[in-house]
Amino acid sequence: MSAPAFKLRPYAPADEDAAIELWRRTWQLAYPRIDFSTRVDWWRQRWREELVPVATIMVAEADDMVVGFVTVDPTSFDLDQIVVAPEVQGKGVASALIAEAKRISPRGLDLHVNTDNERAIRFYEKEGFVISGGALNWRSGAPVHKMSWRPPAS
């Protein structure tokens, strides 16, 4: 069976419900002991107040469904969220979203990833990111790595 075809496009307000549900679903799979259904209202508020106003958001779409998205603030280099549906993970969607993030913010990208998320860390390293610091997530208190990508010097 071939990988589903997908396309990248700019976020539209009509994508909000699908993006937030995808965000919830992927985090629920990553952290099954936490009930993320109780956080949907908080995610929606954060989406509307913190991400949409400042970030460039690109959506991956397959069969008219949102299967991924990335949020990038090109003024601060911040890649806040990259979310990919489990059914298309490993099919190039995340790499395409990272490539798009690099296009949006060509001077560099920074992100934070939980230190126990080894799969994501390996993926980011494969995409050219390096661990550039560490901290505690100010919301959850979990330890995080700061990972950074900068373009090669010309």
PLM regions: where:
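Conserved N-terminal entry element of GNAT/NAT acetyltransferase domains
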Residues: 1-14, 149, 153-154
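Active-site acidic-Proline motif in GNAT/NAT acetyltransferases
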Residues: 85-91, 115-116
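Conserved GNAT acetyl-CoA-binding A-motif
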Residues: 104-116
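Acetyl-CoA-dependent GNAT
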Residues: 10-87, 98-100, 104, 137
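Conserved active-site alpha-helix within GNAT-family acetyltransferase domains
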Residues: 95-96, 116-133, 139-142
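Short hydrophobic/aromatic beta-strand or adjacent loop that forms the aromatic wall/cage
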Residues: 55, 142-147
